[in-house]
């Protein structure tokens, strides 16, 4: 069954002001699907995700849910329903787990009931975070910080999650657990996923395309 395209890029070029890092990239992410981008360090995988979000210089055509987003600011892309979970986890280390999660819902700060519901939903996926909700994020293990980064992205109620190397630096059992939960998020919450990954075996097992 072919899926309708949620995200579509055509002839995408990206740079940080110097030579182009991405040249003429075209791809689609199906609505409700999981698409994987594989490649070694330095291949431009992280730049691809940043280009979608407007975090670097770009040209080409990028459409999300039928809207052109190649000229939109990062915050406007986020408001459309794109959650970017960067490599290095990107958590605010001095804040508690729960404060980090609430920051993830900053675009919906008036929706107190919905935010409370979504907190319980992510704690259902990641029970360890519930145990550590009052703990400073900087004292969490690497695996817990990755769970927190994914959960913070979920607090946006995204249509699409961009995941940058979620397995990096983590023990294999923790990685398997995180990938299992990502599949559940995809299937139960109907969140599409664009996954950048070096671990080809795990990534291809998770992906539709």
What does each model-found stretch correspond to?
Residues 4-209:
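Glycine-rich phosphate-binding loops of nucleotide-dependent enzymes
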């Amino acid at each position: 069954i072919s899926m309708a395209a949620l995200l579509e890029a055509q002839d995408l070029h990206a740079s940080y002001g110097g030579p182009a890092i991405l040249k003429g990239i075209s791809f689609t992410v199906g609505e409700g699907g999981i698409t994987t981008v594989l490649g070694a360090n330095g291949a431009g995988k992280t730049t691809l995700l940043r280009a979608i979000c407007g975090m670097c210089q770009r040209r080409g055509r990028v459409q999300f849910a039928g809207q052109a987003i190649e000229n939109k600011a990062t915050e406007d892309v986020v408001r459309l329903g794109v959650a970017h979970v960067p490599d290095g986890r990107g958590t605010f280390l001095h804040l508690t787990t729960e404060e980090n999660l609430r920051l993830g819902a900053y675009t919906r700060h008036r929706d107190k009931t919905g935010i409370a519901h979504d907190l319980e939903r992510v704690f259902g996926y990641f029970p360890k975070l519930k145990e550590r909700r009052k703990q400073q994020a900087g004292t969490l293990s690497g695996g817990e910080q990755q769970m927190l980064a994914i959960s913070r992205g979920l607090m946006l109620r995204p249509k699409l999650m961009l995941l940058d190397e979620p397995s990096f630096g983590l023990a294999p059992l923790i990685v398997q657990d995180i990938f299992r939960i990502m599949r559940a998020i995809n299937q139960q919450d109907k969140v599409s996923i664009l996954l950048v990954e070096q671990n080809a075996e795990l990534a291809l097992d998770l992906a539709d395309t």
